[in-house]
């Protein structure tokens, strides 16, 4: 419900008619197919333009269901928790497996840094982990380009990489909810989404570290009985990926056959 009331007020003040907001009742809301079916039913009963108010799960559910119902949507982000706000595709668990479904990015996106800074620290930590993963992901892309596998896109690469140092400069400030630092984090995440949108590929924003997350998705990884956020899984993958890159740099590759 964070920011939902304010969005309702702003639209009402602008004279825009609104349906009754749909709020998922399940406190353990997850990007899972049963919730897709629930929201599909809601949207099928109206011709209203969907406005997602929330973070990753709400955005992915609304993105896919809007596509199912033949319309575009906008999103009001409430946390700097992941890079998918501005990218195509929705990650949804169906038949026990996490899958990426093809669907367009939102037509519009709004994020108030003061609201995101007030989100639980674990959500910003998840976003920070997702963003720091862009460093080894960028290295992976450079290696892939060097061996002729996946050509670099200089525009998309720069969109992701150029602002990383500043966006990642103060993890303590992000954890403490410093508005300026959370805003920098959010900007980095949104730019990553734009890069994926520009290339219609996740290549600019993900590398080997994301494969760990995909594996754990398929294994239904939980911690203390709860699902683990995408960012945290990617963060652990980043540790493994960077360790491998360090080993690669130390390896006498010129001696390899």
Provide a role label for each language-model segment.
Residues 42-45, 66, 99-104, 108, ...:
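Solvent-exposed alpha-helices and their adjacent loops that cap or buttress functional pockets
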Residues 43-65, 69-78:
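A short, small-residue-rich loop immediately preceding and capping a beta-strand
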Residues 67-166:
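A glycine/threonine-rich phosphate-anchoring loop and its flanking beta-alpha core
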């Amino acid at each position: 419900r964070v920011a939902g009331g304010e969005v309702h007020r702003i639209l009402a003040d602008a004279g825009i008619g609104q349906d009754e907001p749909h709020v998922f009742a399940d406190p353990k809301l997850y990007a899972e197919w049963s919730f897709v079916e629930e929201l599909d039913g809601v949207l099928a009963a109206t011709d209203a333009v969907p406005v997602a108010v929330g973070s990753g799960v709400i955005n992915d559910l609304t993105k896919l269901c809007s596509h199912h119902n033949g319309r575009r949507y906008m999103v009001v982000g409430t946390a700097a928790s992941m890079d998918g706000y501005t990218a195509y595709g929705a990650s949804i668990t169906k038949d026990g497996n996490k899958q990426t479904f093809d669907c367009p990015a939102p037509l519009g996106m709004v994020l108030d840094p003061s609201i995101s800074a007030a989100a639980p620290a674990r959500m910003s930590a998840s976003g920070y982990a997702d963003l720091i993963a862009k460093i080894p992901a960028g290295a992976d892309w450079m290696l892939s380009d060097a061996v002729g596998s996946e050509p670099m896109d200089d525009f998309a690469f720069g969109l992701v990489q150029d602002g990383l140092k500043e966006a990642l400069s103060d993890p303590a400030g992000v954890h403490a909810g410093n508005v300026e630092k959370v805003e920098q984090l959010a900007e980095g995440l949104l730019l990553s989404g734009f890069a994926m949108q520009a290339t219609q590929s996740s290549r600019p924003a993900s590398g080997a570290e994301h494969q760990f997350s995909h594996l754990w998705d398929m294994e239904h990884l939980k911690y203390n009985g709860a699902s683990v956020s995408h960012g945290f899984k990617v963060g652990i993958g980043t540790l493994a990926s960077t360790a491998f890159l360090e080993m690669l740099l130390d390896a006498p590759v010129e001696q390899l056959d």
